[in-house]
Swiss-Prot record:
Gene3D superfamilies: Hexapeptide repeat proteins, Spore Coat Polysaccharide Biosynthesis Protein SpsA, Chain A
PROSITE patterns the UniProt entry points to: HEXAPEP_TRANSFERASES
Binding locations of Mg(2+): D102, N227
InterPro entries, per database record: Bifunctional_GlmU, GlmU-like, GlmU_C_LbH, Hexapep_transf_CS, MobA-like_NTP_Trfase, Nucleotide-diphossugar_trans, Trimer_LpxA-like_sf
Gene that specifies this protein: glmU
PANTHER family named in the record: BIFUNCTIONAL PROTEIN GLMU (PTHR43584:SF3), NUCLEOTIDYL TRANSFERASE (PTHR43584)
Record-listed acetyl-CoA binding positions: A422, R439
GO biological process: cell morphogenesis; cell wall organization; lipid A biosynthetic process; peptidoglycan biosynthetic process; regulation of cell shape; UDP-N-acetylglucosamine biosynthetic process
Name of the protein: Bifunctional protein GlmU
Keyword Endoplasmic reticulum: no
HAMAP family, per the entry: GlmU
Region annotated Linker, chain positions: 230-250
């Protein structure tokens, strides 16, 4: 059976009170509609068609290469939205799944089971349903004695006995593709909203003698639709729990999973420990046997094996195996920390390479620089890389020593085995085995204390 997917993503979402197109609001680092499309792609459909409207260009950019797109110029209901895909799907044989782009929690497993059930039962239409703890506000699924779906009753229209039903419509449907397009031509807009409803297709098919069934999924929470910021927060909470539990099943330890925020595309190796209050975002990859402590934030970075990150921020950077950083340090974009290097507290590195086994202990800024291996950088060292107009680069060779409080004014080259005395301001190259001293000589003024002025109530002692 060929599979097709239609994603409805044309609504504006006024209840979100936002300038951002609703389905582009993120849940754990991915737009809601991208979660939906990625789940659909996992069932390997022959086509995915996304119906776009408001913010179409932005949606197409997010889903580039993952879907075809059709514009719905006027938003005239769910049935009207599906009709826009006629040119892409109407001539095809198979089954079509219809899902909205603001339901980010549906899994590929649920879609796969819906397709399979639809095919096994020989249905013309299959409604994805769930048992709701509190079904108020949802459309209720009314079945006949054989379990076939008779109708979907909305809250405002239901009789008392119908409203006792807890099986609800999730808004996801699977149709025989040919039956769908025949029925859509019969859907009218004779209702208070003047819209074309996709749910009318079910009644049209049933009256035509076609079989309409329902597949009840076990997890009601998957069906959460996001229409406001409260629902967005709830979807994020559920997705975060799902992500963290997945990592834990793969061998990652979470000290307090409820407070660890991990984006959907993050990868973490086994035997790594994530403490509470950690944020890991984007396409970050973390190796095995690492420790990420409270207060750390890692974005779009690669962390090797055996790395310790202590209450630090890492952005678009690489830390190789057996390195450590922190507390309270910051890797800015394009920092490369090579194997065995140590960065202590209050160290900032930007667009710089720190070589193997090099130590940068504390209170240091390294920007636009390449440091070799086995270097010791003392406390309070500054790589002065900016003249107010341009950035300049400095290179420090292997096994060099940079004394505390020194400033290296770029661009300069410090050779292998060079020494820079503490509190020096270095403006010229330093050769191999040389020691550079660039500071004023110390002068001790004898009896200077006695030359200081006294207040009226003081005397020299």
């Amino acid at each position: 059976m060929e599979k097709y997917v239609v994603v409805l993503a044309a609504g504006k979402g006024t209840r979100m009170k936002t300038k951002l197109y609703k389905v582009l609001h993120q849940v754990c680092g991915k737009a809601m509609v991208e979660h939906v499309v990625d789940a659909a792609r996992a069932v390997k459909p022959s086509k995915i068609v996304t119906i776009v409207g408001h913010g179409a260009e932005d949606v197409e950019k997010v889903l580039a290469g993952k879907s075809e797109f059709v514009m719905q110029e006027e938003q005239l209901g769910t049935g009207h939205a599906v009709m826009q895909a006629e040119g892409q799907l109407a001539a095809l044989e198979g089954a079509t799944l219809v899902v909205t782009g603001d339901t980010p929690l549906f899994t590929s497993e649920t879609f796969e089971k819906l397709f399979a059930y639809h095919e096994e039962e020989g249905n013309a239409a299959t409604v994805l349903t769930a048992e709701a703890p509190d079904p108020f506000g949802y459309g209720r699924i009314i079945r006949d004695d054989q379990g076939n779906v008779l109708r979907i009753v909305e809250q405002k229209d239901g009789k008392p006995e119908e409203l006792k039903v807890k099986e609800i419509n999730t808004g996801v449907f699977c149709f025989d593709n040919q039956d769908l397009w025949v029925a859509l031509k019969q859907v009218g807009n004779d209702n208070s909203q003047g819209e074309y409803y996709l749910t009318d297709v079910l009644e049209i098919l049933r009256k035509a003698g076609k079989k309409v069934g329902a597949y009840k999924m076990p997890d009601f929470s998957e069906s959460l639709g996001v229409n406001d910021r409260i629902a967005l927060a709830e979807a994020t909470r559920i997705m975060q729990r799902r992500i963290n539990e997945g990592h834990m099943r793969d061998g990652v330890t979470f000290i307090d999973p409820a407070t660890a925020y991990i984006d959907a595309d993050v990868e973490i190796g086994n035997d790594t420990v994530i403490e509470g209050g950690v944020t890991i975002k984007g396409h970050t990859v973390i190796g095995s046997d690492c420790l990420i402590t409270s207060g750390s934030r890692i974005v779009d970075s690669q962390i090797g094996n055996g790395v310790t990150v202590t209450s630090s921020t890492i952005e678009e950077s690489i830390m190789e195996d057996n390195t450590d950083i922190g507390p309270n340090s910051h890797l800015r974009p394009k920092a490369l920390i090579k194997r065995g290097a140590h960065l202590g507290n209050f160290v900032e590195v930007k667009k710089a390479e720190i070589g193997e086994n090099t130590k940068v202990g504390h209170l240091t800024y390294v920007g636009d620089a390449t440091l070799g291996k086995d270097i010791n950088v003392g406390c309070g060292v500054i790589f002065s890389n900016f003249d107010g107009v341009k950035k300049f680069h400095t290179t420090v060779g292997d096994k060099s020593f940079i004394g505390a409080g020194s400033t290296l004014v770029s661009p300069i080259n410090v050779a292998d085995h060079a020494f820079i005395a503490a509190d020096s301001t270095i403006t010229k190259d330093v050769g191999k085995y040389e020691m550079a001293i660039a500071r004023g000589r110390q002068v001790n003024k004898k009896d200077y204390w006695h030359k200081l002025p006294l207040s009226e109530d003081e005397e020299w002692k």
